Amino acid sequence: MRIGIPRERLTNETRVAATPKTVEQLLKLGFTVAVESGAGQLASFDDKAFVQAGAEIVEGNSVWQSEIILKVNAPLDDEIALLNPGTTLVSFIWPAQNPELMQKLAERNVTVMAMDSVPRISRAQSLDALSSMANIAGYRAIVEAAHEFGRFFTGQITAAGKVPPAKVMVIGAGVAGLAAIGAANSLGAIVRAFDTRPEVKEQVQSMGAEFLELDFKEEAGSGDGYAKVMSDAFIKAEMELFAAQAKEVDIIVTTALIPGKPAPKLITREMVDSMKAGSVIVDLAAQNGGNCEYTVPGEIFTTENGVKVIGYTDLPGRLPTQSSQLYGTNLVNLLKLLCKEKDGNITVDFDDVVIRGVTVIRAGEITWPAPPIQVSAQPQAAQKAAPEVKTEEKCTCSPWRKYALMALAIILFGWMASVAPKEFLGHFTVFALACVVGYYVVWNVSHALHTPLMSVTNAISGIIVVGALLQIGQGGWVSFLSFIAVLIASINIFGGFTVTQRMLKMFRKN
């Protein structure tokens, strides 16, 4: 089957549904790829790069003659007319907000897969395009805030005086929120974050931010991986928290969204008016109405007291190269599910919950919404039950047996000491102490330090190898035992270096 990559015609859209790297992966699945001329120009991918990757460059509407169409945005009306019956379209669709679009696509007797309808389950993470774009949006939000903010993010002490660090508050600790937290923290800002879901507290703290909590308990999970609408009492408590924080922080990033509903208003005009002059608010929910009452979608609005409210709706498109690569990879992972035989043909299997969730129209029949998939939150740690007190069974062994074994061991040691060389007692004492000390040292080391501990064992094994090599030329059993010692110690050395090398690779960026 042929995959077509048309040029995105939506105003200000810079992304493309495939990159040269993803084209190579599509070819390995058995597909042929046709790219409309100039489709990747705004994302820094020219036609030559696509040709080198193995794609065919086509002109005009011929790309729409492909059996599979990969796009970023939903097709326009004139593009829908170019879809042939039986074609499979994959793009962002937003079926809840676009019922007329769904009807028009169904009338063309096509199959439509919406990348915004990927189920929030672990198995579908590799094709979760919303998370990919949210990650970029959160990062870019901090970049835009830093551009508009008039000071450093990090604190400094210079000859000209002390520069205080910027204070950043992130509302919503989803993918976008965590990306914003990481970017702001890496720039040296003091970061604090709030989320209605208490289970994300550890994630926020692991990113180096302070987690803001309310003295209010309420279940925030909705069962589908998203937050739900909270009670009036909870909203009142969080609004009081935001009002207090607005007077302290310099930058606010809001990411709160509820699927299928307008974005909740979390930052009121009074809160913005109480902020310091030069402060910045980045509203990632601007496209759905915004979390701030001052937000103007697609623009920067400056209030009378000098607070800038950024309402850009194209933050992922402001990093087009990265966005296209991540989105293209999400599409490749979806096609891997559809084409398990790698023969260039796809199978829409509704027994697969991921494919069922993504497919909103199947052969002209609207199949959205898919049956809900319940997603369980991370379970709370259960309180440990008091250990049961068990009465120890009395040993039926006779006490003389233990004393007899101890006496036998003493007699055996005395006999060996009488017939062995004088140096034996010294060597045996050192050996016994080494066994005791080594046992307690190794078993009291934390599991996280076992890999670094291998460097010490490598040194000890090296000493064993040296000692064995000095004895290996004596012949007889001595040579045989020396060879065994060299073999076992060498295995420990090479294995230790291999594991240590793997550990060190985990700390490298490349």
Curated annotation (Swiss-Prot):
The keyword Cell membrane applies. It is found in: Cell inner membrane. It is an enzyme of class 7 (translocase). Its EC number is 7.1.1.1. One of its GO terms (molecular function) is proton-translocating NAD(P)+ transhydrogenase activity. It catalyses: NAD(+) + NADPH + H(+)(in) = NADH + NADP(+) + H(+)(out). The keyword NAD applies. Residues 1-401, 444-452, 498-510 are cytoplasmic. One of its GO terms (cellular component) is plasma membrane. The chain crosses the membrane at residues 402-422, 423-443, 453-473, 477-497. NAD(+) binds at residues 120-122, 175, 195-197, 238, 257. GO terms for biological process: NADPH regeneration; proton export across plasma membrane. It comes from the Bacteria. InterPro entries: Ala_DH/PNT_CS2, AlaDH/PNT_CS1, AlaDH/PNT_N, AlaDH/PNT_NAD(H)-bd, NAD(P)-bd_dom_sf, NADP_transhyd_a, NADP_transhyd_a_C. Keywords: Cell inner membrane, Cell membrane, Membrane, NAD, NADP, Nucleotide-binding, Translocase, Transmembrane, Transmembrane helix. Pfam families: AlaDh_PNT_C, AlaDh_PNT_N, PNTB_4TM. Heterodimer of an alpha (PntA) and a beta (PntB) chain. Alpha subunit serves as the dimerization unit. The transhydrogenation between NADH and NADP is coupled to respiration and ATP hydrolysis and functions as a proton pump across the membrane. This is NAD(P) transhydrogenase subunit alpha. It comes from Escherichia coli (strain K12). The gene is pntA.
